[in-house]
Curated annotation (Swiss-Prot):
This is UPF0246 protein SCO2297. Pfam families: H2O2_YaaD (PF03883). One of its GO terms (biological process) is response to hydroperoxide. It comes from Streptomyces coelicolor (strain ATCC BAA-471 / A3(2) / M145). InterPro entries: YaaA. Coiled coil: none annotated. Belongs to the UPF0246 family. One of its GO terms (cellular component) is cytosol.
Length: 260
């Protein structure tokens, strides 16, 4: 099983250990594309601060994120599982999982990123600010920048098992599974049952809980149909729609009755 996650916008502080080594990250086929974004991002943020803030879509209160990006090559790196914070990652609570569940997380979780493309939880990265919606002056829109290298690398990473896609729209646009990989993919929405609407905070929290449940129990569905049954067994209310045509993902709605 491969689980595709969005990053968090806010991040924990960089570590005090060794700095980033791009060549040591998972999915080495993305190295050149990573280094291209990294180089331009550092250069942008080392220049005119107001321009960098505008390009990155940062408010006045997030001005300090520009300076943080200038230190990406020298800041101490930490495992991505410690860098990403926020609602989804708080609900996942990776640090509190037992050793076996952490090993499953290391194998199966892939976090998408405007800067790194995609990283595993054990990949050591510095704290950064660069969303997939950013359009860098030289490289252009990052979503478009990542499509070709992702298309080369990720089908192999997906293997022959289930792909559980929990990404938000901007990150989903960077790689869309195709063909037989798409047929093994399930996308998930979390809906407030009375209104049938997505509530952002609870959507993220529920997705984090779903991933935690799968990891903690060692549940490894072989495909989308098995995922539906597994989630129901774990206590989730799930509505599923199989694709009308082959080579397309399944669509799953997880219904929640209390928003908290």
């Amino acid at each position: 099983m491969l689980v595709l996650l969005p990053p968090s916008e806010g991040k924990a502080a960089s570590g005090r250990g060794a700095p980033l080594k791009t060549g040591s990250l998972s999915l080495p086929g993305l190295t050149a594309a990573r280094e291209a974004v990294l180089g331009e991002l550092v250069e942008l943020c080392a220049g005119d601060e107001e321009k960098a803030r505008e390009v990155l879509g940062l408010s006045e209160g997030l001005r300090g994120e520009v300076a943080k990006n200038t230190e990406l090559l020298t800041a101490g790196a930490r495992p991505a599982g410690e860098i990403y914070t926020g609602v989804l990652y708080d609900a996942l609570d990776l640090a509190s999982l037992d050793a076996a569940a952490k090993r499953r997380a290391a194998r199966s979780l892939l976090v998408f990123s405007g800067l790194w493309g995609a990283v595993r939880m054990t990949d050591r990265i510095p704290s950064y600010r660069c969303s997939m919606g950013v359009k860098l002056p030289g490289l252009g829109a990052l979503g478009a920048h990542w499509r070709a290298p992702m298309a080369e690398v990720l089908p192999e990473a997906a293997g022959d098992g289930l792909v559980l896609d929990l990404r938000s729209a901007a990150y989903a646009a960077a790689w869309k599974p195709k063909g037989e990989v798409a047929a093994r993919t399930a996308t998930v929405r979390v809906l407030h049952a009375p209104t049938r609407k997505v509530v952002s905070h609870f959507n993220k929290a529920t997705k984090g809980r779903i991933v935690r449940s799968l990891l903690a129990t060692g549940t490894a569905p072989e495909g989308p149909a098995e995922l539906v049954e597994a989630l129901r067994d774990l206590g989730y209310e799930v509505e599923a729609e199989a694709p009308a045509k082959g080579g397309r993902p399944w669509s799953l709605d997880v219904l929640v009755h209390e928003v908290h």
